[in-house]
A protein has these predicted regions:
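Conserved active-site carboxylates
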Residues: 114
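Long, positively charged amphipathic alpha-helical accessory segments at protein N-termini or as interdomain linkers
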Residues: 3, 13-14, 79, 85-107, ...
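N-terminal lobe of the biotin/lipoate ligase/transferase fold
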Residues: 1-101, 173, 260
Length: 260
């Protein structure tokens, strides 16, 4: 399977500085350390293999070497920091669009930070703030299952890859460079409009929502909340109808599951 190419992933007209490494513990941890050492925003780090990749709640992100997209971006959006939580929502939308542009799939967004295809997780995102000597920065980590065919038993019913989702198409593999480049191009555009363009984007996020209308169980600050996902507000918060008839917005959650 072809290795990732930094020269192909780079787009000269955009401010990204793309690097590709063979193996690393975690691309997000590496960028956090780079930021603390004085690295400027715009660095994007792809890895063919991660030995300590992670998602929310420190869950490990496992992927076979050279098959998927595992990368992180070091960001400093020009908008006030109050708008930075929007980055994860915009990135999920970008991933959906990039997949749809390349493949005959209709990805959906599972609030707050996953992308689903055929009711299974195909991508996860994690944004973390880091305080540096030059001010606040953001590390956005993205894991996208592209060419993985086999998953561990504990994930086989809940995870998928793009290649698995488009079978029986004849390709032996999907082009990771093309998909990664498309994500970087669209992500730059969306982040540049994080302040004034978000309300337009959130309408599409609603249309792509996997959760809306479902009964869910969310873990928020260690406690469980049950309810029906009604809507997303203009900031991308989940509006939940509770069993007692009250309505509550959730700005984040450690875990969200559908209640069958």
């Amino acid at each position: 399977m072809p290795a990732l190419s930094a020269s192909t992933l780079n787009t000269p007209a955009l401010p990204w500085r793309v690097r590709v490494v063979e193996e690393i513990g975690s691309t997000s941890d590496a960028l956090r350390e780079a930021a603390l050492a004085g690295e400027s925003a715009g660095l994007v780090l792809f890895a063919e293999s991660q030995t300590a990749g992670r998602g929310r709640r420190q869950n490990r992100w496992l992927a076979p070497k050279g098959k998927d997209l595992m990368f992180s971006l070091l960001l400093r959006p020009e908008a006030p920091t109050a708008f930075w939580p929007r980055v994860t929502t915009l990135a999920a939308l970008v991933i959906c669009r990039a997949i749809e542009d390349e493949l005959p799939l209709r990805p959906r967004i599972k609030w707050p930070n996953d992308v689903y295809v055929h009711d299974r997780k195909v991508a996860g995102l994690l944004a973390e703030a880091v305080t540096t000597s030059s001010g606040l920065m953001l590390v956005l980590g993205i894991g996208l299952n592209v060419n993985t065919r086999d998953f561990p038993p504990d994930l086989s019913d809940t995870a998928t890859s793009l290649l698995s989702a488009v079978q029986p198409m004849p390709q032996l593999h999907l082009d990771r460079d093309s998909l990664g480049r498309a994500i970087l191009q669209q992500l730059h555009h969306q982040i540049s409009r994080i302040e004034e363009g978000f309300h337009e984007a959130i309408s599409e996020v609603r249309e792509r929502s996997w959760l809306l209308g479902r009964q869910i169980r969310a873990t928020v600050d260690g406690r469980e909340i049950f309810g029906r996902a009604l809507d997303l507000d203009q900031e991308g918060h989940l509006i939940l109808a509770l069993p007692d008839g009250s309505i509550t917005p959730l700005s984040s959650a450690e875990r969200v599951r559908q209640v069958v």
